[in-house]
Amino acid sequence: MNMRSSTGRQPKANNADRSRNSLSTTARPALRVQKRWQPKARRVDTAIAPRAASPISQTELETALRQEALQAAQRGDHNEAIALFTLILEQNPSSARDYNNRGLVYFQSGDMERAIADYNQALALDSTLDSVYNNRANYYAAQGKFLEAILDYDAALDLNPTNVRAWLNQGITLRELEMHDRALECFDFALRLGRLEAHVYAERGRTHHLWGDWNAALTDYQRAIERLSLPNTATPGGAARLRLQIEVWKDELLAPLEPAQ
């Protein structure tokens, strides 16, 4: 099993509740009070009225919808996430990033045809987004189109050499092609970036394992587990799932070494 990695605030309502005093028109002192306070009341009304009538901007609305969509995707509610991203795109059809976001949710839900369509549309709108190339490469790898995947990972890294996810995913793909030495180079570079270390150590350990260097594999598996024990460790798919995968790989490696019963 290979674990590839894919890459708003609600506006506060301003309610101005204004109260006006009823002034007597029969008593002269009351008239003097009215003349003295009327200008101040008008100044308050003028200052408050624009705030009370201020509508939410299109940008604020998109930000709020996008935040809701991302939260829905994180909890696995793909239908809601897709519906929200679609709503954003209906209002802003030139948003390449939201085509990429919706494409990723389609990919996660298994709708590959719509996923690749959204990735292609995102790149047609903006060919400089390295995250789209990384996501489209993951699509190609899942389809067994490894050459296309490698080319897209290369494109992502040409645009952004610090895209650790692209280095990680390219290493996994090269390993699947049994190009273990080149895969290790990708993982080594990813580790220099200092992010997603637990995941990178796990995948590098798996590469050593499959290449026959069991000592190096065990060392990297242990390093990955140690990184998962650190606070605020961010790993694609969650720390628990990654730890389980590492334990499966370790058991697979150690099984031939156990004495027969």
Model-identified regions with their sequence ranges:
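Terminal, low-structured helical/coil segments at or just beyond the last alpha-helical repeat
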Residues: N2-R4, G8-R9, P29-R36, K40, ...
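TPR-adjacent "capping" and linker segments in tetratricopeptide-repeat scaffold/adaptor proteins
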Residues: A47-A64
